[in-house]
Amino acid sequence: EKGEIVAFIGPNGAGKSTTIKMMTGILFPTEGNINILGLDPKKHRKKLAYEIGTVFGQKEQLWTHLTPYDNFKFFGAIYDIPNSVVEKKIKEFEELFELKDFINTPVRNLSLGQRIRCEIVASLIHEPKVLFLDEPTIGLDPVVKENVRSLIKRMNKEYKTTIFLTSHDVGDIEKLCKRVIIINNGQVVLDDSMENLKYHYLNKKIVEAKMKEKVNLDDEEGITILKDKGYNIKIEVDTEKRTVADALKLLNPDNIIDINISNIPLEDIISSIYKKEDQS
């Protein structure tokens, strides 16, 4: 749907990046058909380029010796956009993506987070109907990741741009997407709402703790022991049955030297989905 943010995920080698490359006309399918906005990426590659934007987190599209401002002007010229319109768009994005402090700094001198913001803006200059984001937050520190996610949400709300996102980061998916498509070996194994995925698969937390003194734990309802080496404990908490606070009480907070609480890795979530698919 227009304005939807869709997560397209799967394990390494599942075919995510290949699918995006076929959807954008970079690669062609050996069989079957692809339809993007009523266009065949193979037959209408040039026409489709005016309707879509792409950002590959590990590949640069900006000229590093130019400033972001000059890059944006360059991309505007490529898409035959009148200079006055490009200037207006640059001003809008400069404010929305908070580019003012570095818009006239050569791209090679920007931080990774700053460059990613500029990469996204460069892909939006021609106002695409669909934006493909392939690992947009890869390599970013947590604070910068959160900033980029916030900016993507604001952009989506402001311009109603449909976003097709691939990422191995649960945070990207959980905070940006309302729909999730999971593939493996080029096949769709799940297409569901983020709400349902959260309910079924993101209701567990991993708690890792370093203890002052050895503790002996037993599995209890909602708590599964993953590692128990006395001073180092790793447990899985089912938050539908027990709270993380309950788990910490079992460990005794006064006995904890260090602790880390995290989501189940996305790869594990995907694996559990595959197992359910196999069983069914």
Tell me what each language-model feature is.
Residues 73, 77, 84-102:
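Conserved ABC ATPase "signature" region
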Residues 149-238:
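ABC transporter nucleotide-binding domain
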Residues 32-42, 47-50:
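Conserved ABC transporter NBD signature motif
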